[in-house]
Amino acid sequence: MAYVINEACISCGACEPECPVNAISSGDDRYVIDADTCIDCGACAGVCPVDAPVQA
């Protein structure tokens, strides 16, 4: 299961550089995770100050 970024995202960008497979990019109102690229490692969740990345 891939991670998704929920509506709690404050677009701080902390998660993007932590992703080892570059699955995270900035979206219109929050960051988004490409489910096909995500390897479910949880690195994004570990650095998010608002716990926005959650397992889908």
Swiss-Prot record:
According to the entry, every stretch annotated as the 4Fe-4S ferredoxin-type domain falls at 1-28, 29-56
Q: Tell me, in a sentence or two, what this protein's role is.
A: Ferredoxins are iron-sulfur proteins that transfer electrons in a wide variety of metabolic reactions.
Residues given in the record as [4Fe-4S] cluster 1 binding sites: C9, C12, C15, C48
From which domain of life does this come? Answer: Bacteria
Q: Which PROSITE patterns match?
A: 4FE4S_FER_1, 4FE4S_FER_2
Cofactor binding: number and manner: Binds 2 [4Fe-4S] clusters.
Q: Which organism is it from?
A: Gottschalkia acidurici (strain ATCC 7906 / DSM 604 / BCRC 14475 / CIP 104303 / KCTC 5404 / NCIMB 10678 / 9a)
The organism's taxonomic lineage, starting at the top = Bacteria, Bacillati, Bacillota, Tissierellia, Tissierellales
Task: Output the InterPro entries linked to this UniProt entry.
Answer: 4Fe4S_Fe-S-bd, 4Fe4S_Fe_S_CS, 7Fe_ferredoxin, PSI_iron-sulfur_center
Supply one GO molecular-function term. Answer: metal ion binding
- What gene makes this protein? fdxA
Q: What is this protein called?
A: 4Fe-4S ferredoxin FdxA
Q: What Pfam families is this protein classified in?
A: Fer4_7
Keywords, alphabetical? 4Fe-4S, Electron transport, Iron, Iron-sulfur, Metal-binding, Repeat, Transport
One Gene Ontology term, aspect cellular component: cytoplasm
Q: Which cofactor does it need?
A: [4Fe-4S] cluster
Q: Which residues bind [4Fe-4S] cluster 2?
A: C19, C38, C41, C44
